């Protein structure tokens, strides 16, 4: 039996996909603006 690949960890989740990480780069900011224009209720992790 192989182990499950998803091992939940909220801190790691926020640090790799979080809002502040998205705001750091130009590409990340474009992702956020795209999600805003689409009307997503949750912008990032």
Swiss-Prot record:
Region described as Disordered: spans on this chain: 26-45
Keywords associated with the record: Ribonucleoprotein, Ribosomal protein
GO molecular function: structural constituent of ribosome
One Pfam family named in its UniProt record: Ribosomal_L34
GO biological process: translation
Gene3D superfamilies (alphabetical): 1.10.287.3980
Record GO cellular component, one term: ribosome
InterPro entries, sorted: Ribosomal_bL34, Ribosomal_bL34_CS
PROSITE patterns: RIBOSOMAL_L34
Protein family (similarity comment): Belongs to the bacterial ribosomal protein bL34 family.
Protein name, per record: Large ribosomal subunit protein bL34
Taxonomic source organism: Parafrankia sp. (strain EAN1pec)
Gene this protein is translated from: rpmH
């Amino acid at each position: 039996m192989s182990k499950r690949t998803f091992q939940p960890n909220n801190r790691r989740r926020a640090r790799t996909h979080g809002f502040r990480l998205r705001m750091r780069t130009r590409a990340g900011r474009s992702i956020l603006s795209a999600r805003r224009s689409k009307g997503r209720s949750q912008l990032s992790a």
